[in-house]
Amino acid sequence: MSEPKTSATSETQTGTMTVKTGLAQMLKGGIIMDVINADQARVAEEAGACAVMALEKVPADIRKDGGVARMADPRKIKEIMDTVTVPVMAKCRIGHFAEAQILQNLGVDFIDESEVLSPADDENHVDKQPFNVPFVCGARSLGEALRRISEGAAMIRTKGEAGTGNVVEAVRHARQINREIRVAQCLSSAELYGYAKQLGVPLDLLQKTAKLGRLPVVNFAAGGLATPADVSLLMQLGVDGVFVGSGIFKSGNPEKRAKAMVQAVTHYNDPKVLADVSEDLGDPMVGLNCEHLSEKWAQRESVHKS
């Protein structure tokens, strides 16, 4: 049995929010790819991914197969960690602090408390503050984002609708967060107090967000990105990087598409480069219309707002 991975997120170096958010800052301008085995992890790293997300199944297969989706097998996570040198993330269920404790013990670099897996607690998210490993959490709105940050999340991503190959929900969530930040910037101190109560978030976090004009932590896009153009669209909307899951390894040419997606993150403002890297990528993953989904994963959040 291999020893837990020694990484930048070892216990002696982490624990404070400043350190954890600093580790997330190192991923800015990058792409994080979902992988289910060592071979896929190798493809992702060789393509230029800044990190990989270790999963039992990609989101498209989770949707297709149904049932309860849980944390990946620790052996699979360790195999992926032993294969690549880039940071390795892994998902735990919403509210499942025991899964998070196991993942921290394995030595993963980040934990994603994810709505893609079946929620374990419909009233509480994991208290992320005591953990030494940084957490990633999804958000559809400024309120959701700041609630997760108040719980200790060091990185936010749009929820989108993973496994659909349809970017519409990720765009909606990115625009919603941007819109609500602009509203906050226009409010007086007294009005911000009322807005914080309306959103169900700590006043100090809302004040900091209004002053910065952006979330106080790294904000990536996720959920349904399947083409270089999708990546460019979200980057131009102001996110710091992207997660891509089923869109790569459910496509006709994963190796070429992975490299193209990496180029799209770097050259998101250059239509010529985007056109070049978009050529001959093979068939994209088969997409789903989000309005026809029987359940939207993005709606999975604990009921408490404080």
From Swiss-Prot:
Record-level GO BP terms: amino acid metabolic process; pyridoxal phosphate biosynthetic process; pyridoxine biosynthetic process
EC category name: lyase
Keyword terms: Lyase, Pyridoxal phosphate, Schiff base
Reaction catalyzed: aldehydo-D-ribose 5-phosphate + D-glyceraldehyde 3-phosphate + L-glutamine = pyridoxal 5'-phosphate + L-glutamate + phosphate + 3 H2O + H(+)
Transmembrane segments: none
EC number: 4.3.3.6
Active site (record annotation): 91 (schiff-base intermediate with d-ribose 5-phosphate)
The keyword Lyase belongs to this UniProt entry's keyword annotation: yes
GO terms for MF: pyridoxal 5'-phosphate synthase (glutamine hydrolysing) activity
Chain residues that bind D-ribose 5-phosphate: 34, 163, 224, 245-246
Entry keyword annotation includes Lyase: yes
InterPro entries reported in the protein's UniProt record: Aldolase_TIM, PdxS/SNZ, PdxS/SNZ_N, RibuloseP-bd_barrel
Record-linked Pfam families: SOR_SNZ (PF01680)
UniProt pathway: Cofactor biosynthesis; pyridoxal 5'-phosphate biosynthesis
Binding site for D-glyceraldehyde 3-phosphate: 175
Induction and repression of expression: By ethylene, a major product of degradation of oceanic dissolved organic carbon by photochemical reactions initiated by sunlight.
Physiological role: Catalyzes the formation of pyridoxal 5'-phosphate from ribose 5-phosphate (RBP), glyceraldehyde 3-phosphate (G3P) and ammonia. The ammonia is provided by PDX2. Can also use ribulose 5-phosphate and dihydroxyacetone phosphate as substrates, resulting from enzyme-catalyzed isomerization of RBP and G3P, respectively. Also plays an indirect role in resistance to singlet oxygen-generating photosensitizers.
Protein family per UniProt: Belongs to the PdxS/SNZ family.
Full protein name: Pyridoxal 5'-phosphate synthase subunit SNZERR
Gene this protein is translated from: SNZERR
